[in-house]
Amino acid sequence: MANLRSVFEQLNDVSLRAVIQEEAYRDIKLTIKETKTYNPYAHPVAVADSLEKLGIETNPFAVKAHTHAAAKTIELDMYKIVSFYLPKENPTTFMFMKRSKLQYFRRGPQQKDVFLNAHIEPKDVARYDVDTLFDKNVTPQITTNTAFMGDTLHFLPLTAIERIFKSSPKLQTLYATMVLPPEALHRLHSLHPGIYELEFHQEHFIYKPGGHAGAAYIHKYEQLEWIKVGRFKWADEKGLTHMVTSQILETKGANHLFIFQRGRFLTPELRCFSTETKYVTMPPIFLPKQFNARLPIKKTTAQQLFLYVKSVKNVTERDIWAKMRQLLKTSELQDYNPREVTLLVNYFLLIARLRSETCFDNVLSGGMFKKLFKPFIAWWEIQKHKIFGNEEFEQLMEALEWVDVTLTYPTKTFDNRGWVVKLEARRGYEWFADEMHKPKGPELNLEEKKTDPDAASYEKYLKALSLLQKEPEVMEAKEAEATDEPQRPEVKEEQAEASTSGRAEEIQEDPATKKGKEEPNPNRDLLCPCGLHLKIKNAEFPELPVLDHPDHLTGRKAWFFSKDGKPYSYTGGSHASRGWPNWLEKILAAIEIKEPLPEFNQCLVQQFKLQAAIPFHRDDEPCYPKGHQVLTINHSGECLTQIACQKGKASITMGFGDYYLSPVGFQESHKHAVSNTTGGRVSLTFRCTVQQNKFNDDGSMEALDNLPWKAWIPKLQNLGFQGRQLQYDPNGALISPIEEIRSMPKCKPEGVPEVVYKTLDGLARAPTPYSPNPIRARAYTSDVKNCRIGALLRQQGKEWGCRFDALVEAGKRELAISVIHGAGGSGKSQALQTLIKDNPELDITVVLPTNELRLDWLRKLPKAPQEKFKTFEKALLAPPTPIVIFDDYGKLPAGYVEAFCLYFSTVQLIILTGDCKQSVHHESNENATTSSIEPLVKEASELCRYYINATHRNKKDLANKLGVYSEKTGLTEVTHGTTPIPGLHMLVPSLYKKQAFSEMGHKVSTYAGCQGITAPKIQILLTEETSLCSREVLYTALSRAVHSIHFVNASPNNQAFWKKLECTPYLKAFLSTLREEVAQPIEEKKAEPTPVEPPRTHIAKEDAMVEYENVIEKMPEKHEREIFSEKHGHSNCVQTEDPFIQMFSHQQAKDDTLLWATIEARLVISNPKANWQEYLEKRPVGEVLFESYKRAMHLPKMPIPFEEDLWNSSMHEVQKTYLSKPENMIKNGMARQSPDYDPNVISLFLKSQWVKKMEKLGAIKIKPGQTIASFHQATVMLFGTMARYMRRMREVFQPAHIRINCEMTPEDLSSWAAGEGGHWKFKGPSLANDFTAFDQSQDGAMLQFEILKARHHSIPEDILDAYLTIKTNSKIFLGTLAIMRLTGEGPTFDANTECNIAFTHTKFNIPEGTAQLYAGDDSAIDGLPALRPSFKMIEQKLTLRSKPQVALQQKGDWAEFCGFRITPKGLIKDPKKLHASWMLEKKKGNVKNVLRSYELDLALAYQHKDSLHELLSEEELKYHYETVRSIVKSGGGGVLNTYISKDESLY
């Protein structure tokens, strides 16, 4: 081992070390996996070391606790050991064992084991099932030849073996585990203190596993005899002696596994038990005997004490006591008795005083004569000492004769025979029963099997079990048989009933009764005089489509159809082909569901006139092969069908749905005719110009001797195909299920198991020599090294890439290869999967191009270890097994397989599976070297012995159109549409469309990327890119469907719309191209109220500008007000030299100082884990908020059903709004429209604005601005749709006394508040909330509120998950943001408004019917509601804070809402704020652009004329009048003029 270790240490190559580590890791993983079953517990280090010395592995990462984990582990390990001895097939009897422990014996219900238990102790009542109990006073009979008893036999007397074997003649072998510490024979303390402890009493001793008294065993000392007995003897009534031989199979600590075998066998004469520590006992050197130290002591301790007392001069008793205390650990002191310690000290005190220098002479000194007499002298000295006493040296030697405690005992025989039998045995007459005639176990003879009910039931059980085990395979075989074999005609109900009843008289009917039946037999025979039976059958056929432009013949019209497009000519007519429409396949399918049909590639549809006829003729034109069969269908109407031969004629009337198939040779031996047709009678005649399949009467297919692939039929049958059908592609060419057959040499690589080679050779896929192409391999390694390709490999670092490239460059080798090519669904991987399933121990690595395909393999092989299956990049990071399977290898990068083989020299055999006719890997990076080399499939095709051109996936019609052989019957449904069908797997031509439709919620794959997918139904998106796809790519896409294909061609016709869609490459990814027709709303004309002329008066003219002087005087100098940053300098918010303009802060997006100050003030950086934790912690608060909101908004108690139409309408509204933007704005957002844009990434901008809030005019210090978050456009539109949808739903249930300022004009709000029947009462103070950091404070509680609200609206869960993700994972360039509201999310306004409502109603107890207005973070309530007491309980859990603003609702003090004053006359603008904003625009010279909007705002108050004296204070009137004069002088007044008469002036 030391040499091997030194060799390993000298290995400095990283790849070689990785190989060794990988091999070691596999073993470690298997070991840890096994510990989860037998040793799942956490152990202290010392205990774990003890267990490993006993051969029991311990998982160092285990955390499971147990009161006596070590003892329990040994118990389970004993079960594992005995599991290897128990029979694998036959049942075993388990005694005193719970059923739940059967798993530790690696057994299950398939063995049908028997359990025998008894209630002996009270705890047994809860442990054992009632159906397993036996009478504890009667020894049960064991009916199996093997039994097991767990940890119980040691409590029973030795006679128990006789009773068990005597009562069970079938029993041959009994396995039993016992817990008997052998050291208890010597009253030794536990030899394994970490595993168990011992406590000794006068007649009993106690075994405590793990020192835990709750699981203790109380034993008598005589029970220890079990570990010494090797044979048990007893005599039966006849005097015959029986014997059972016992032997210990394993012993670990106090746990022992015994085997008791009926009969006389050899057993070891000694029983030995191991000890971790050696013990010795001191010889008795004192009298009386009771004063000798007799308990064992550790030999190491004894040696230490002996050396100590002999190394110290004049050692005293106190010295020995001190040394004893030094040597004994504190934890060990409890194991020593003070009396024994005292006796031990006296023993060592005595030997300390004895001389250790020998008293005898040596043999080295003296001359020859002296040496000659020295032995005699020595003898004499010994004899003298015996008489007169020993010298001290001799006394010391005698005192040091320590006795080693070895725990080895001779085996005994327990003889329970009577004294007479024993006496005869001593005289040589000991009789034993003949072992050849002793009772057997379940091995019974034939007669016994017939009479033994247990054996019969057991046989039935095994048979049923085998069927259950094979059920998956049986079901697969049945499905294959159903697809391979033609379906038989259905058995009629009368026949089925007769066959099941078993009474023949029930099917005997009177002819008159048959005639009176309402449902005649649809199968009739046309009997020809020559004896030919032409069976006329009936079926329900689908309606025919309207057929135009017929060919006109005598008495009929005709339409000809053919698959190959060739015309049809015959004597008297010629027809051009009209193709082969799908409805013809449906006509044939109506018959094929009842019986198999041969191939047909032509059909003549004829519509007859009244009494039309076709004379006798044959369909034996030269274009048809000899012996071909013709199918004639009477689709509608009636006719008289006649046949004729040399012996005569026969006729029959055919009606609706009748048809017949002419037998082989009919066209050569018979003629047929049609006459007496009804008007409009339609017939279909199917023929075939190529060789047809032939079927027997029972539906089975006749064997064709001239099949080109006849020799390959056994291989096809192994794949689940019959291989006997003749099938043709659309061009009429015969489809061969086996193609591209090649012959090449075979090789059998070393290290490949025989079962693998035989499997491949049986498939005719024997390995052949292969030398990887180094040029292709270098191309791949170069791309990896230079990070041109790959995802996972790019993260391995430059060093790994260089080493990878160097090893491949230096590699040159030859290995074995087996290439398996076949169509999709041909079963090319099935044999390999079966090989892995049946041989799980094989070292095989499966490399897969995608994770989807890896999951598919795991689904098919759920019991196989997951590490066998790796994606291609991960496979390069760990050494593989000698056999590697590359499934669907065409999707691997070019050069990968070659690089893999050269990189790993341990690979001996590679198996490639794929389809050379399907798409291959495409490298999108044009700079990559691998993008310019050919795919491996071309080279691998030359190493493939044959191609399987057959499929189980596609139905025959679709497969044949693709040129593939299929025996799956039925029709593939093909539909067309302009919109995708939700839920169907969609195939698209490009990657960006895949990303786009994936974002819309579709399950999407590209044409090329769908390889390996099988779906019952698929939909294929057709675009202008479809025509650019190769044949292989289209073949891949079309071959995915099992039952139906839906083609989607969604192309809007509006050119302006197309232009806007095409302005960026990604816009179509998230826009729906459906059209929506919106009805024009019809507004009802309201009756105009009769105006009341107010008294004419004027407002005093005063200059309002002086009111701002106090603010201007207090303003500091510009740079004192600006924000300063050391990196970016001062901000630039105070602009121009005009003091009035300087009152207003101008925030600009380009101001870096202001941007960083805003980010610092408005944003909080967190991480996803903290965000999720906050969300979880505050979910209860969110539930409270939602309940308050639901009650306030009168939402129904139960969730609102989801309305798909309303969702689509909301989506179109959002898209319409987005598309209404100018084209340049859409182009500016190109990056955010890209599917590659990270949906969690947010671009931040500073909002450019003039701060016009009155409280911020002339601020001494400039305040931070407001950020705008730019999200992924698809995210914005998705959640915008969600918000729009919930808004529409909210409007349905929203009470009349609550209004949200959304899509409403000031006039609408005025009418609602103060109009006729207005909701605002003005009967007391009003309340408004002034929030602090409203957006920043919407934390996890508000997020939970939003989730609950959306879930109540039945928003799909995937959208909610996405919303949770974006809220908890949103990140900017500084990191992940905390949960908060961001301007630009999509649902910002609606979410802010609803959070405001929820918070307000949670905080205040607002009476029902109180008028309320909400808009974002603004609100106003017509009243002063009381604070809810419950709000104080959750206030500290909410980040959001609000300061109530109370208005007395009297002159000059009205409720404020969104810059409006809510007055009894309606909503008006705040006069002072309006005046200040207007003067700012005027001084900026921007009057022309804003004049009309300001005049409209002013008109809200101006229209009330002199009534303003009742609403506004004197100061407010001054501002109002000054604004009117300034606007009129600036060229306005057009709107104001509409409120005065002609003879009035504007001011």
Swiss-Prot record:
GO terms for molecular function: ATP binding; ATP hydrolysis activity; mRNA methyltransferase activity; RNA binding; RNA helicase activity; RNA-directed RNA polymerase activity. Residues 599-690 form the Fe2OG dioxygenase domain. It comes from the Viruses. Residues 1324-1431 form the RdRp catalytic domain. ATP binds at G822, A823, G824, G825, S826, G827, K828, S829. Keywords: ATP-binding, Helicase, Hydrolase, Multifunctional enzyme, Nucleotide-binding, Nucleotidyltransferase, RNA-directed RNA polymerase, Transferase, Viral RNA replication. InterPro entries: (+)RNA_virus_helicase_core_dom, AlkB-like_sf, Alphavirus-like_MT_dom, DNA/RNA_pol_sf, IPNS-like_FE2OG_OXY, Oxoglu/Fe-dep_dioxygenase_dom, P-loop_NTPase, RNA-dep_RNA_pol_alsuvir. Residues 793-948 form the (+)RNA virus helicase ATP-binding domain. Residues 949-1082 form the (+)RNA virus helicase C-terminal domain. SUPFAM superfamilies: Clavaminate synthase-like, DNA/RNA polymerases, P-loop containing nucleoside triphosphate hydrolases. Transmembrane segments: none annotated. It catalyses: RNA(n) + a ribonucleoside 5'-triphosphate = RNA(n+1) + diphosphate; ATP + H2O = ADP + phosphate + H(+). Residues 477-523 are annotated as: Disordered. Residues 477-495, 503-522 have a biased composition (Basic and acidic residues). Its EC number is 2.7.7.48, 3.6.4.13. GO terms for biological process: DNA-templated transcription; mRNA modification; RNA processing; viral RNA genome replication. Residues 59-227 form the Alphavirus-like MT domain. RNA replication. The central part of this protein possibly functions as an ATP-binding helicase. Belongs to the potexvirus/carlavirus RNA replication protein family. This is RNA replication protein. The lineage of its organism: Viruses, Riboviria, Orthornavirae, Kitrinoviricota, Alsuviricetes.
